[in-house]
Swiss-Prot record:
Catalyzes the conversion of L-tyrosine to L-dihydroxyphenylalanine (L-Dopa), the rate-limiting step in the biosynthesis of catecholamines, dopamine, noradrenaline, and adrenaline. Uses tetrahydrobiopterin and molecular oxygen to convert tyrosine to L-Dopa. In addition to tyrosine, is able to catalyze the hydroxylation of phenylalanine and tryptophan but with lower specificity. Positively regulates the regression of retinal hyaloid vessels during postnatal development. This is Tyrosine 3-monooxygenase. Pathway: Catecholamine biosynthesis; dopamine biosynthesis; dopamine from L-tyrosine: step 1/2. Its EC number is 1.14.16.2. It comes from Rattus norvegicus (Rat). Phosphorylated on Ser-19, Ser-31 and Ser-40 by several protein kinases with different site specificities. Phosphorylation at Ser-31 and Ser-40 leads to an increase of TH activity. Phosphorylation at Ser-40 activates the enzyme and also counteracts the feedback inhibition of TH by catecholamines. Phosphorylation of Ser-19 and Ser-31 triggers the proteasomal degradation of TH through the ubiquitin-proteasome pathway. Phosphorylation at Ser-31 facilitates transport of TH from the soma to the nerve terminals via the microtubule network. The modification Phosphoserine is found at residues 19, 31, 40, 472. It comes from the Eukaryota. It is found in: Cytoplasm, Perinuclear region; Nucleus; Cell projection, Axon; Cytoplasm. Residues 1-31 are annotated as: Disordered. GO terms for biological process: aminergic neurotransmitter loading into synaptic vesicle; animal organ morphogenesis; catecholamine biosynthetic process; cellular response to alkaloid; cellular response to glucose stimulus; cellular response to growth factor stimulus; cellular response to manganese ion; cellular response to nicotine.
Length: 498
């Protein structure tokens, strides 16, 4: 597919780049309203992690001595209490452990599991280890057993069993992934451009209802956009398209040309999600699904695992065409969709989603940060020059100029570094990560994902649109059989053409 043969710009200062635009564009780029940015997946993921950590800390703090059963978490099962207990030994003598174990023997507790772990709260002069025991004891003996353990051990507390967070196993279960972040809802946020516009707020509710009612397998309902909405789209479309030839990566340019040819991408009409979804399905297997706003990080990333991109249908307020505090269809259709039409980038996006399934809150926050610095704000090298591939850049006139100017710092993409890099959500990014190629980024991401601690691996089955959980020799063997069938087909094809 040929790409526009426009000369690539040399990096220049951001202010110089802005000064070369017309007055209206320059004002939009530098105005405070434009510089503010939508809430990110990272912020949502961090809030989820901090809330979970606070709940766990509160549970630990409330399990100090007093009432032996106060704040103890256990499961009732046929008259028995089943629980997890953590404790540290009192002193360093070998007999310390035997005294603790003797307590469980005295009460005839059935021990299911016993292990040592690094102590979360090591005590001075004590081994930096603690003991985890899962046991079962008659419910009537539980209080006495806990009191006895506390007499011979330190830092005794119950612990919830580490459970893998729920995640969808089949694509239809994405109907359950609808947790929205409401901070930038025009009904709730005083700073939202549409807060004082009752007509706009009512329009948003009408379009949001489409997403709330949508179920997997249904065609995405069409939206009849108003003249004002189309005018807003036109201003964004024309302004950004003028930069793509010199600032966007070749994959975005090729995808954008195809969308103009086959999906009705043009300045005087907003594409319908159903038409775009059908096009993507044929190109890379990705599908669109309507969403009413900004999804929680875990739900959004889980959707990517199924090659489903959650996409808004509403458009930003007419008073702020160059900026939206939340994702809207300009951001999705102009930034994300052309990139999802590329097979390698589509696989990269799905890999991030697969890595998120069953991951801890801490890992979700890190993956969201990797997503932020790649899929949203990533740069790549092409023909020795920097180009933009992140949707946050390709749908933001000001940041697209800024990212390829001399002002920001550019670092080589490394998932371990990007995962903990502080991000900027109030102005333009001071740091961007550049990938040598999408294949290189994909390989680095897979290496990073392989080190995420989960008691299983996952594999997407493209025939059933389901997630295979590889947690036993049997499930792995079954998956290998499918790979062997594919290899046989490829080997036959090679022999046929050689």
């Amino acid at each position: 597919m040929p790409t526009p043969s426009a000369p690539s710009p040399q990096p220049k200062g951001f202010r110089r780049a802005v000064s070369e635009q017309d007055a209206k564009q320059a004002e939009a780029v530098t105005s405070p309203r434009f510089i503010g940015r939508r809430q990110s997946l990272i912020e949502d993921a961090r809030k989820e992690r901090e809330a979970a950590a606070a709940a766990a800390a509160a549970a630990v703090a409330s399990s100090e001595p007093g009432n032996p059963l106060e704040a103890v978490v256990f499961e009732e099962r046929d008259g028995n209490a089943v629980l997890n207990l953590l404790f540290s030994l009192r002193g360093t003598k070998p007999s310390s452990l035997s005294r603790a174990v003797k307590v469980f023997e005295t009460f005839e507790a059935k021990i299911h599991h016993l292990e040592t772990r690094p102590a979360q709260r090591p005590l001075a002069g004590s081994p930096h280890l603690e003991y985890f025991v899962r046991f079962e004891v008659p419910s009537g003996d539980l209080a006495a057993l806990l009191s006895s353990v506390r007499r011979v051990s330190d830092d005794v507390r119950s612990a919830r069993e580490d459970k893998v967070p729920w995640f969808p196993r089949k694509v239809s279960e994405l109907d359950k992934c609808h947790h929205l972040v409401t901070k930038f809802d025009p009904d709730l946020d005083l700073d939202h451009p549409g807060f004082s516009d009752q007509v706009y707020r009512q329009r948003r509710k009408l379009i949001a209802e489409i997403a709330f009612q949508y179920k997997h397998g249904e065609p995405i309902p069409h939206v009849e956009y108003t003249a004002e909405e189309i005018a807003t789209w036109k201003e964004v479309y024309v302004t950004l398209k003028g930069l793509y030839a010199t600032h966007a990566c070749r994959e975005h340019l090729e995808g954008f040309q195809l969308l103009e040819r086959y999906c009705g991408y043009r300045e005087d009409s907003i594409p319908q999600l159903e038409d775009v979804s059908r096009f993507l399905k044929e190109r890379t297997g990705f599908q669109l699904r309507p969403v009413a706003g900004l999804l929680s990080a875990r739900d959004f990333l889980a959707s990517l695992a199924f090659r489903v991109f959650q996409c808004t249908q509403y458009i930003r307020h007419a008073s702020s065409p160059m900026h939206s505090p939340e994702p809207d269809c300009c951001h999705e259709l102009l930034g994300h969709v052309p990139m999802l039409a590329d097979r390698t980038f589509a696989q990269f996006s799905q890999d991030i989603g697969l890595a998120s399934l069953g991951a801890s809150d801490e890992e979700i926050e890190k993956l969201s940060t990797v997503y932020w610095f790649t899929v949203e704000f990533g740069l790549c090298k092409q023909n020795g020059e920097l180009k933009a591939y992140g949707a946050g850049l390709l749908s933001s006139y000001g940041e697209l100029l800024h990212s390829l100017s001399e002002e920001p710092e550019v670092r080589a993409f490394d998932p371990d570094t990007a995962a903990v890099q502080p991000y900027q959500d109030q102005t333009y990014q001071p740091v961007y990560f550049v990938s040598e190629s999408f294949n290189d980024a994909k390989d680095k991401l897979r290496n990073y994902a392989s080190r995420i601690q989960r008691p299983f691996s996952v594999k997407f089955d493209p025939y059933t649109l389901a997630i295979d959980v590889l947690d036993s020799p049997h499930t792995i063997q079954r998956s290998l059989e499918g790979v062997q069938d594919e290899l046989h087909t490829l080997a036959h094809a090679l022999s046929a053409i050689s």
